[in-house]
Design a protein with these regions (language model features):
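Alpha-helical membrane-targeting segments
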Residues: 136-162, 203, 208-246
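Mid/C-terminal beta-alpha module of Rossmann-like enzyme folds, strongest
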Residues: 171-234, 248-274
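Oxidoreductase cofactor-interface core, primarily capturing Rossmann-like NAD(P)-dependent enzymes
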Residues: 3, 20, 96-205
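NAD(P)H-binding glycine-rich loop region in Rossmannoid oxidoreductase-like domains
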Residues: 15-21, 25-72, 76-78, 91-99
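Conserved Rossmann-fold NAD(P)-dependent oxidoreductase catalytic core, especially the SDR/UDP-sugar
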Residues: 6-8, 47, 53-54, 68-127
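Residues in the short beta-alpha loop(s) of Rossmann-like NAD(P)-binding domains
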Residues: 13-14, 190
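Short, amphipathic alpha-helical "lid/cap" segments that border enzyme active or binding sites
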Residues: 35, 39, 45, 71-74, ...
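Residue-level signal for the nucleotide or nucleotide-sugar donor/cofactor binding architecture
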Residues: 33, 65, 160-166, 192, ...
Length: 274
């Protein structure tokens, strides 16, 4: 797809800027929780892609960054005559789940703000996004390489539909150009259980460590303690979300774009090769 113009990335700190070293984009400082910092960030932009989120913290943190942050940037975007908006939400976000955990509540409120904004928009709800640099797969790979057993939460029958990060990036770019509108739920080409995901990951790593299923009731009290850490490995809210499925209802909206979506085994091979 031909693309014109320049990508501008808003970062809060030198650390954020360093992570984009070598990426072809302009950098601008800003913080979605500081409305006054956003005017320069969106000035002259045709489209805004909202990727800001937190995955652990207090309810007020989720609201401040995800929900209110979206409102703040929407206000700046409208004032700057931005013509299009792409919102990165999360699969599982629905009216019926908004009171389940603060994360879903904040994501839902952010979606509602976008829907009410009057801007042409696309709201993306991906399943787990897999990639080589950070995120879930490197964490799982470290466990599979180092732990004596593979800790699987619950029965392991909960389903997920991982999608490769480059596929998501292409979909974001196409939505920013106006190819698709509205709500899009995105998954990769394979729907698997957590049991199967771990089995495939072990195959990719060449390890045969045995599985150990940990009931949610057993892990939840430990999560209470872990939540006191600066970057907890798991929280009670995350356990609540992991108890359910995370696959899209058919049809998979990712198929609208005609992309050769990366199969799960290839996703895992790429992610563990780095």
């Amino acid at each position: 797809m031909p693309r014109a113009g320049t990508v501008r990335a808003m970062v809060r700190s030198d650390k954020g800027a360093a992570r984009l070293a070598g990426v072809e984009c302009d950098l601008v400082r800003g913080d979605v929780t500081d409305p006054e910092s956003l005017q320069a960030a969106v000035a002259g932009c045709n489209a805004v892609v909202y990727l800001v989120a937190v995955i652990a913290g207090r309810a007020s943190d989720f609201d401040r960054v995800i929900a209110q942050g979206t409102r703040n940037l929407l206000e700046a975007a409208r004032a700057a005559d931005v013509r299009r908006w792409v919102q990165m939400s999360a699969l599982g976000t629905r009216r019926t789940t908004k009171d389940l955990v603060p994360y879903f509540h904040a994501k839902w409120e952010a979606e509602e703000a976008v829907r009410a904004s009057g801007l042409p928009h696309a709201i993306l709800r991906p399943s787990f996004v897999f990639g080589p640099d950070g995120g879930l797969v490197p964490r799982l790979a470290r466990i599979a390489r180092l732990a004596p057993v593979i800790p699987i939460l619950g029965p392991g029958t909960q389903r997920l539909q991982p999608i490769w990060v480059d596929d998501v990036a292409e979909i974001v770019a196409r939505c920013a150009s106006g190819e698709q509108n509205g709500l899009l739920e995105l998954g990769g080409p394979d729907v698997v259980s957590w049991n199967e995901l771990w089995a495939r990951l072990k195959t990719a790593l060449g390890t045969r460590r045995p599985d150990l299923h940990l009931p949610f009731w057993f892990v939840r009290p430990q999560a209470v303690v872990l939540e006191r850490l600066p970057n907890p490995p798991v929280t009670r809210d995350q356990l609540t979300m992991l108890e359910g499925d995370d696959n899209v209802a058919e049809p998979n909206d990712a198929l609208r774009f005609g992309l050769p979506l990366v199969p799960l085994d290839e996703q895992l091979r790429r992610a563990v090769a780095t």
